[in-house]
């Protein structure tokens, strides 16, 4: 009798978990926008308690609606949130997902700049990975307007703030001549 009850319980538990996953609500753009409204507090400061949840909502929307024209935008915004959360691995994952699924989106090259500068260079202080991100932008998007920025960022890798400032001043003086 106990064995039958245990078996029945396990079967019901399994059926319940399947039913829950099948009835998972499909997110709409309105759901995403509602989540977005919770991201900033009244002082326009990121609500760090809600940030991870909002980023997950963005990612879930993209997963459920991969052909929606706004999908690349939400992936990029999820990446931005994860930059603020200092979640480097998730940023890299989202950047790669964005480039792989939406290579023609203008958000793809932007994600490489974000990944290279804020994640690899600033947070991880890994100039080799930053260089790879910038070079990937140059190689995969040679006609994009951010290529010149990527080239400058490569030249600035490893420089101190003072050296970067001197480099900018020197280039401005050369332009004036």
Feature-to-residue mapping (PLM):
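TPR repeat positional signature
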Residues: 31, 35, 75, 112-113, ...
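Residue at a conserved register position within TPR or TPR-like alpha-solenoid repeats
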Residues: 82, 119-120, 158
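Short solvent-exposed coil/turn linkers within tandem alpha-helical repeat scaffolds
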Residues: 61-71, 85, 100-108, 124, ...
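C-terminal motif of bacterial Sec signal peptides marking the signal peptidase cleavage site
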Residues: 16-19
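Structural register within alpha-helical repeat arrays
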Residues: 78, 115-116, 154
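Bacterial signal peptide processing site
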Residues: 21-23
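Alpha-helical segment of the N-proximal tetratricopeptide repeat
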Residues: 30-60, 64-65, 84-85
